[in-house]
Amino acid sequence: MSFPYFISPEQAMRERSELARKGIARAKSVVALAYAGGVLFVAENPSRSLQKISELYDRVGFAAAGKFNEFDNLRRGGIQFADTRGYAYDRRDVTGRQLANVYAQTLGTIFTEQAKPYEVELCVAEVAHYGETKPPELYRITYDGSIADEPHFVVMGGTTEPIANALKESYAENASLTDALRIAVAALRAGSADTSGGDQPTLGVASLEVAVLDANRPRRAFRRITGSALQALLVDQESPQSDGESSG
């Protein structure tokens, strides 16, 4: 007589967690950090069409690591939720904390009820409305729906420990955009060097996706930094002059 295969709930949760963590660890790293002008997002991403960083609403941005199709579904769902709420009530009623809570509930439900968890980690960031003085808000949402409020920076995907350690040593509050980008890129290089046997990789315009939530913009804070504008900022890291211009 054969007995049905039984797995305890605790073991099932452990296996789901391990699956999700391994999937996220295979992804390229993403860093989000607060700087003097708002929030800077920097991702290792050689693709120009599959974006890991996005605008969610006027003052709210999004970054993710993991499986693209899974976090892109979440991104589009977040945009739809924000648009609907902003239209039904008021644009100021859409907040980063609110969207982070929605994502946490969604991921928690998927983790406990579906056969396979999402292999994703998310960051939702918000800057103050134009004319207000309030520090940026950064929220990390993990595959199981856990949510954490991070005061300075968020690291996701890849080998996070060396990147987080580098940021702990080099992060400076109220840094300029040029300095913040230098800190973020150096931290990403530290993570890549850890996985490549100590060789410091070259992270340039072609391999980086960069965007900011600019608190000094009147309505829509999100802007991408690409092409010559990004190149100028990367060059300024060696001979700092100005924060340059952005495009996109």
Swiss-Prot record:
Pathway: Protein degradation; proteasomal Pup-dependent pathway. GO terms for molecular function: threonine-type endopeptidase activity. InterPro entries: Ntn_hydrolases_N, Proteasome_alpha, Proteasome_alpha-type, Proteasome_asu_bac, Proteasome_sua/b. This is Proteasome subunit alpha. It is found in: Cytoplasm. Keywords: Acetylation, Cytoplasm, Proteasome, Virulence. Its main location: cytoplasm. GO terms for biological process: modification-dependent protein catabolic process; proteasomal protein catabolic process. Belongs to the peptidase T1A family. The formation of the proteasomal ATPase ARC-20S proteasome complex, likely via the docking of the C-termini of ARC into the intersubunit pockets in the alpha-rings, may trigger opening of the gate for substrate entry. Interconversion between the open-gate and close-gate conformations leads to a dynamic regulation of the 20S proteasome proteolysis activity. The gene is prcA. The modification N-acetylserine is found at residue 2. The 20S proteasome core is composed of 14 alpha and 14 beta subunits that assemble into four stacked heptameric rings, resulting in a barrel-shaped structure. The two inner rings, each composed of seven catalytic beta subunits, are sandwiched by two outer rings, each composed of seven alpha subunits. The catalytic chamber with the active sites is on the inside of the barrel. Has a gated structure, the ends of the cylinder being occluded by the N-termini of the alpha-subunits. Is capped by the proteasome-associated ATPase, ARC. HAMAP family: Proteasome_A_B. SUPFAM superfamilies: N-terminal nucleophile aminohydrolases (Ntn hydrolases). Component of the proteasome core, a large protease complex with broad specificity involved in protein degradation. GO terms for cellular component: cytoplasm; proteasome core complex, alpha-subunit complex.
